[in-house]
A protein has these predicted regions:
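Conserved SAM/SAH cofactor-binding pocket of Class I
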Residues: 14, 18-97
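Hydrophobic alpha-helical segments and their boundary regions
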Residues: 6-8, 36, 65, 163
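Short hydrophobic/aromatic-rich motifs at helix boundaries and adjacent loops
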Residues: 1-3, 47-52, 104, 125-128
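Nucleotide donor/acceptor-binding cores
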Residues: 6, 38-40, 140
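Non-catalytic substrate-recognition/targeting regions of SAM-dependent transferases
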Residues: 1-17
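S-adenosylmethionine
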Residues: 34, 68-187
Length: 188
């Protein structure tokens, strides 16, 4: 392994997130480009927990991983353990933040987050534009992926209307990743 790199060990079980899909890889590349020392992370739609694990291994202080699938909570915990990340550095929540006001209040109340990750389909991301930007720290980064290229403009529009500015965009294999911040960058 090259010097200065960190090895991530994953078992996705039946949850999404092996690290081989373009959407996951782009999110991981964006995380690697950020300074995460001491960062508070929210991973929405965590699947196997791969993005939360990556953020912690890159210096994040705490990650909250949320998914609608109960199995994702178990798989995320197992993958955190495989990577030497104690339960004090992460927590998990199961539920659908779009349909559960109590979960939205809990997730929002634990913010602000320095990094919010959401690698989910475009329709869900567009609906989450009503919540995620408000949970982001002033200089935080919102990393969105799971966006098929034909839907990217809809997602861009939804988050721009929510006050976000796209500071980085990666497209690969028909998929798009957007990294957004509040009112910063050139792509407003």
């Amino acid at each position: 392994m090259p010097e200065g790199r960190t090895l991530l060990t994953m078992d996705p079980a039946s949850s999404f997130g092996t690290g081989s899909h373009a959407t996951t890889r782009m999110c991981m590349e964006q995380l690697d480009a950020l300074t995460l020392d001491g960062a508070r992370i929210l991973d929405v739609g965590c699947g196997s927990g791969i993005l939360a694990c990556t953020a912690l291994l890159l210096g994040g202080r705490h990650a909250l991983a949320c998914d609608i699938e109960e199995n994702a909570m178990r798989v995320t915990a197992e993958n955190m353990d495989k990577n030497g990340l104690s339960g004090l550095r992460y927590s998990t929540r199961c539920g659908d933040l779009l349909s559960d006001p109590a979960l939205r209040q809990e997730l929002g109340g634990q913010g602000p987050y320095d990094v919010i990750l959401a690698n989910i389909v475009a329709d869900v991301l567009i609906a989450m534009a009503a919540y995620l930007p408000g949970w982001l720290a002033e200089d935080g980064h919102l990393i969105l992926s799971g966006i098929i290229d034909t839907r990217a403009e809809e997602v861009r529009r939804a988050f721009r209307q929510a006050g976000m500015v796209i500071v980085n965009e990666i497209a690969r294999d028909g998929w798009v990743m957007l990294c957004c911040m509040r009112g910063k960058g050139e792509n407003s």
